């Protein structure tokens, strides 16, 4: 992951990847994890996502990690929340407020506690292929025994678009999470009117996965 690339995106407010509302995939498929309020939730590379609010309405503890300090501060400021901020190192800060615990810094070194449920909408697809194996190793290490992941990926011809977001095809998903129970919940194929197809992609699909340890 090119950290400078993402830092510049947030600094210049070029954040087309940020959705102004809850992702409909989350509201439709979260129930597939059989979640309970007491179960803890982790959202990697969370940005200032509205999905965090949706999850906090249903869970007592929602944690996240985000590279950009700008994004983390914006998350709390836009909601008029005043978090407790703890400096853990020169490159890592912890923001605490009610249900929310968000680390601003490197995903690979943030001390995330083991969690029951993970929601990954925009993290895996933000990473180039050479980083995805290490990313998933860390993700799996943070999932409790019996834990579950709701994963959203994209499938398109990587030769036709450089990314991010990157294509993570089914065979790679199954390889990365081998040894776990993997269920494809949905494949949403873009039609001819989709912006990506209009820009020249021959196919573009969003896939939703339920993964159990």
UniProtKB/Swiss-Prot annotation:
Q: Quick one: a GO cellular component term? A: cytoplasm
The cellular location(s) given in this protein's UniProt record come to: Cytoplasm
Q: Which InterPro entries match?
A: SAM-dependent_MTases_sf, Thiopur_S-MeTfrase_Se/Te_detox, Thiopurine_S-MeTrfase, TPMT
GO BP terms: namely: methylation; response to metal ion
> What's in the keyword line of the UniProt record?
Cytoplasm, Methyltransferase, S-adenosyl-L-methionine, Transferase
Instruction: Provide the binding site for S-adenosyl-L-methionine.
Output: 10, 45, 66, 121
Q: Please report a single Pfam family linked to this protein.
A: TPMT
Q: Which cysteines are joined by disulfide bonds?
A: none
Q: What is its EC number?
A: 2.1.1.67
One GO molecular function term? thiopurine S-methyltransferase activity
What reactions does this protein catalyze?
A: S-adenosyl-L-methionine + a thiopurine = S-adenosyl-L-homocysteine + a thiopurine S-methylether
Give the family, as the similarity comment puts it: Belongs to the class I-like SAM-binding methyltransferase superfamily. TPMT family.
Q: What protein name applies here?
A: Thiopurine S-methyltransferase
Q: Give the organism's phylogenetic lineage.
A: Bacteria, Pseudomonadati, Pseudomonadota, Gammaproteobacteria, Vibrionales
Gene name, per UniProt, is: tpm
